[in-house]
């Protein structure tokens, strides 16, 4: 379980690193490119933005794109959606009784000691507390 968590954290960090590359970087990217220039919030003129919200808008759009990519990735990992269609969900387990049924047996120590199926304990001498 610990290794799965480490794997997913590493994968999310790799996706975040790929999606945060500058525009001129031609390295590997998780986002598909079709040759068109993508307009970003930082490309808008100062008439459309007052300058202070420019960087915030760019980071918000990047963050939204990042979470969309994670959601698409996690949706692609769901085997039930692949098998049963887009409206499928994880099947629910049947309702089980909350308390397990135990045999009607007294749980008192006296009853356990009187039970003949339990082997008797050997007599172990008690340690003396006196010093020699």
From Swiss-Prot:
GO terms for cellular component: extracellular region. Its main location: secreted. It is found in: Secreted. Residues 23-62, 87-132 are annotated as: Disordered. Keywords: Secreted, Signal. Residues 1-20 form the signal peptide. It comes from the Eukaryota. Residues 36-47 have a biased composition (Basic and acidic residues). The gene is sgp2. This is Proline-rich protein sgp2. Residues 51-62 have a biased composition (Polar residues). Residues 91-105 have a biased composition (Low complexity).
């Amino acid at each position: 379980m610990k290794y799965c968590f480490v794997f997913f954290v590493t994968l999310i960090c790799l996706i975040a690193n790929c999606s945060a590359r500058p525009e001129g970087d031609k390295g590997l990217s998780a986002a598909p490119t079709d040759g068109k220039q993508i307009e970003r919030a930082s490309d808008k003129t100062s008439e459309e933005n007052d300058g202070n919200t420019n960087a915030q808008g760019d980071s918000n759009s990047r963050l939204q794109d990042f979470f969309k990519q994670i959601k698409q990735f996690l949706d692609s990992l769901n085997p039930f959606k692949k098998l049963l269609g887009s409206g499928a969900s994880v099947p629910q387990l049947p309702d089980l009784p909350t308390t397990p049924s135990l045999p009607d047996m007294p749980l008192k120590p006296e009853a356990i000691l009187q039970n003949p199926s339990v082997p008797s304990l050997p007599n172990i001498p008690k340690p003396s507390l006196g010093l020699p």
